[in-house]
Regions:
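Short, polar N-cap/turn motifs at the start of nucleic acid-interacting alpha helices
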Residues: 72-80, 144-146, 165-187, 208-217
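Hydrophobic, well-ordered secondary-structure elements that form the walls
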Residues: 98, 157-160, 170, 186, ...
Length: 220
């Protein structure tokens, strides 16, 4: 009603109210994760595509970061994946610890693409694969309408928080930027040892689900 307030209060509320995003990603259930690994065992497409999806699942990286991953970024001896700032959404370098299954995955992939620059090169021979190819491959698994490779990030985050791991380490693993500037200034530690423990526990969790009712080693 006109005349009741001297100014519009809405601008002052901007940034305080969060609008639900229609793009929120689904969290994969245990049954969906089992179905994912069953689908991988039956997959008859390019092996690089299946391996890329496994890498995303194990590391909870963004699909685009996996798609353009380069062999030079991986330190097998140090068990680290070093992603340069230019490739990261937050525009800062990111170091991610690698679990044992990821190291085995790299050994499996190296004879296929190890002679080139990218882990997952484009089929044309130029550049790298596209996140869209990964999305289509995962949707063909019929895990659910909203399932995409990005779901592994929300699934990992949900699981890790439920397990009681420190939020700082989880957010660091996901390469999220701390919104609190003061907190961000004092939270520059890589937390590698803590994150290594988290990622190995996550890999063990996935392996248990993948092997449920199967003797296949698809998770490893």
């Amino acid at each position: 009603v006109r005349g009741l307030v001297d100014s519009n209060p809405i601008p002052g509320l901007r940034g305080l109210l969060k609008i639900p995003s229609s793009q929120s990603k689904a969290v994969l259930t245990a049954d969906q994760i089992r179905a994912f690994y069953r689908a991988l065992r039956a997959y008859r497409g390019y092996p690089e595509t299946a391996l890329c999806l496994r890498l995303i699942a194990f590391t909870a990286c963004r699909p685009g970061e996996a798609a353009d991953a380069e062999w030079s970024e991986f330190d097998a001896e140090g068990k680290l994946w070093r992603r340069p700032a230019a490739k990261m959404k937050a525009r800062r370098d990111h170091v991610s610890p690698l679990s044992e299954p990821v190291l085995k995955l790299l050994e499996e992939l190296r004879p296929i693409t190890g002679a080139g620059r990218y882990l997952f090169p484009h089929r044309s021979g130029e550049g790298f694969t596209t996140p869209n190819r990964l999305t289509y491959a995962m949707r063909d698994m019929n895990l659910g309408e909203r399932t995409t490779p990005h779901c592994w990030r929300t699934t990992f985050s949900t699981w890790a928080n439920e397990q009681g791991f420190r939020p700082d380490a989880i957010e660091r693993q996901l390469a999220h930027v701390e919104s609190n500037r003061v907190r961000a200034t004092y939270n520059k530690a890589l937390l590698l040892n803590e994150r290594r423990e988290i990622m190995q526990a996550w890999a063990d969790h996935l392996a248990a689900l993948a092997h449920a009712g199967s003797t296949s080693d698809a998770a490893n």
